[in-house]
């Protein structure tokens, strides 16, 4: 048996044709940088010419492979070293964001350059988002002016939909937050974003990436209060953002109070303990009595399995609400709170069809228990009711309202006789 390896035949004198897709010239980052910078310098700061140059160069240069280098140059003028400084011994260009005028109009023009480039080469979208995330982490390595320009540009790009609001995650970096860089950067960013759109559009974008409740995290833990956030951004000229965050915090607090109240009621905790908890939360979150009475009503009504039979549910409701009347009375010390409760009862009885005949009996119970008084009931009947089930509930209340009016007249008559 021959153990020697059989020599494979060779093809001599053959020339293989390179595949077309492999013919594209391969550049290393330095060569790529040289080509881009040379082309940018030749445009002479004409951003229309810059956009055309970038459009044409994508057919010759490997944008996909060197996206980071490309965006480094367009923002900072050259390749960035870790930390945000320009890499040593590299050539640079002044045709970039950091060398441009620090004003909104100039940044809007640069935003158009990025917009055209990414629309032309869609595959750059992901690389561009990664670049912006990186740049935000490098903020400490940039000058104040460079940060301001980047903030304005980012705000415009967010408004135009060129970036997802998820890039803002980089601003929650511990060191950036601790040194106040994140909060200051966010001022310029949100100003330009709101200038392009409005606070509702901004809120919608933040909500999509679950950041609508995280804005206070731009500050260190010891400053993460509504008061501090509101003052900081109001003083910076962003009152609408401050109000938005205040409202978000209030909404969050309402949900927490509602959840806790349901649990306390289900556990059968004493009214005094529930009252103390609610009053503490009102003070802590600056929540009005009118808001709290609605939450309290909803919590009390949601912790019961109601009878499906209309003739039985009223009796069940009266029995349940009777024991909670003293608790409700503690949070109807103002006429507006009483009116709010009346509207909540009206809406509840309309939305839950088995309660349609219960409305008047609930109101009478609360009147006798001093949860509701004459004036708000009469006001509700006259013109403060809502459209839901209006005709049914007004008819139910007709006799009781007449009785209230007569009682009021008799009281006034007795007062006059006494005088």
UniProtKB/Swiss-Prot annotation:
It holds the Pfam family W2. The keyword Transcription applies. InterPro entries: ARM-type_fold, eIF5-mimic_regulator, W2_BZW1/2, W2_domain. One of its GO terms (biological process) is regulation of translational initiation. Gene3D superfamilies: 1.25.40.180. Residues 247-414 form the W2 domain. The keyword Transcription applies. SMART domains: eIF5C. GO terms for cellular component: cytoplasm; membrane. Residues 1-26 are annotated as: Disordered. Keywords: Activator, Transcription, Transcription regulation, Translation regulation. Translation initiation regulator which may repress repeat-associated non-AUG (RAN) initiated translation probably by acting as a competitive inhibitor of eukaryotic translation initiation factor 5 (EIF5) function. Enhances histone H4 gene transcription but does not seem to bind DNA directly. This is eIF5-mimic protein 2.
């Amino acid at each position: 048996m021959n153990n020697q390896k059989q020599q494979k035949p060779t093809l001599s004198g053959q020339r293989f044709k390179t595949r077309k897709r492999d013919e594209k010239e391969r550049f290393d980052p330095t060569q790529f940088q040289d080509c881009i910078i040379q082309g940018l310098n030749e445009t002479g700061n004409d951003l229309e010419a810059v956009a055309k140059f970038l459009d044409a160069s994508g057919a010759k240069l490997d944008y996909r492979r060197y996206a980071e280098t490309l965006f480094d140059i367009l923002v900072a003028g050259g390749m960035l070293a870790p930390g945000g400084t320009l890499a040593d011994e590299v050539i640079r260009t002044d045709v970039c964001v950091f060398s441009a005028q620090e004003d909104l109009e100039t940044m809007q023009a640069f935003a158009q350059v990025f917009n055209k480039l990414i629309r032309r080469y869609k595959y750059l979208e992901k690389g561009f988002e990664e670049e912006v995330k990186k740049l935000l982490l490098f903020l400490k390595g940039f000058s104040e002016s460079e940060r301001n320009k980047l903030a304005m540009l980012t705000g415009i790009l967010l408004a135009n939909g060129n970036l997802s609001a998820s890039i803002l995650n980089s601003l929650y970096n511990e060191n950036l937050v601790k040194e106040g860089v994140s909060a200051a950067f966010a001022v310029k960013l949100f100003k330009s974003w709101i200038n392009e759109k409005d606070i509702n559009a901004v809120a919608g974008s933040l909500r999509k990436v679950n950041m609508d409740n995280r804005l206070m995290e731009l500050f260190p833990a010891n400053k993460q209060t509504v008061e501090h956030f509101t003052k900081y951004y109001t003083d910076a000229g962003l009152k609408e953002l401050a109000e938005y965050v205040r409202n978000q915090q209030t909404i969050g607090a309402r949900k927490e109070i509602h959840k806790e109240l349901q649990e306390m009621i289900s556990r059968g905790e004493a009214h005094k303990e529930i009252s103390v908890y609610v009053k503490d939360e009102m003070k802590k979150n600056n929540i009005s009595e009118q808001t709290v009475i609605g939450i309290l009503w909803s919590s009390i009504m949601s912790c019961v399995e109601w009878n499906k039979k209309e003739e039985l549910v009223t009796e069940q409701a009266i029995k349940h609400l009777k024991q909670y009347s003293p608790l409700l009375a503690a949070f109807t010390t103002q006429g507006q709170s009483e009116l709010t409760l009346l509207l909540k009862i009206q809406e509840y009885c309309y939305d839950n069809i088995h309660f349609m005949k219960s409305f008047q009996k609930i109101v009478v119970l609360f009147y006798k228990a001093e949860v509701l008084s004459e004036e708000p009931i009469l006001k509700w009947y006259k013109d403060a009711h809502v459209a839901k089930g209006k005709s049914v509930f007004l008819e139910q209340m007709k006799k009781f309202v007449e009785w209230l009016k007569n009682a009021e007249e008799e009281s006034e008559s007795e007062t006059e006789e006494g005088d």
